[in-house]
Amino acid sequence: MLKTNVYDMSGKLVGEIELPEAVFGITPNESVVHDVVKNHLANVRQGTQSALTRAEVSGGGRKPWRQKGTGRARQGSTRAPQWTHGGIVFAPKPRSYSYSLNKKAKRLALKSVLSAKAAESNVVVIDSIHMDAPKTADFAKFLKAVGCDTKTLVVTAAADQNVVKSGRNIPGCQVTFANVLNVYDVLNAGKLVVDQAALKTIEEVFA
């Protein structure tokens, strides 16, 4: 049974909650986590690199000098790869690096990293995360009050734009939503700050 304290946004202890064991209490599978992180990084890769082959570089139609009699090595074009301004051998072209992984693997990886965070006591539960207006200073004060002023991932149940705007200018802070939680973001954060509504959504979606 995984129990943890619940705090309000001022850092005051308001109760206790049981973390769902199906999500926060499994034995982490490092191999699957590695596969899913690799997949995530490949999927977000731009793949826009591009260079010209010798067939695509402008110019080079004229033979630079005659074939024989100069004492120099024979050359057919000034756009051959060994020349300055020549084409690139096996020039990279724009392509997609993305590939798919099955949902079971992604779900297991997420539960693994959430369980690791819980085992390290790096999951902080808040009764409700809300902001009446976008205020970065107030949000920073809240994070400090709950002991999360380092690299922090804040997870809410709904897309509250006031919370998003309040957190986006704080170095090391990222705000995301429970239904789109991913392995890379959780791994990249030192602390996980979750409100009770988000905790319920995580259990419903990923358990």
Language model: regions and residue ranges:
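Glycine/serine-rich anion-binding loops at beta->alpha junctions
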Residues: 54-90
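Exposed boundary/loop context
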Residues: 4, 8, 18, 40, ...
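Extended polybasic, low-complexity segments that bind anionic RNA or targeting/receptor surfaces
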Residues: 1-46, 91-207
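A short, flexible low-complexity segment enriched in Lys/Arg and Gly/Pro that occurs
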Residues: 30-68
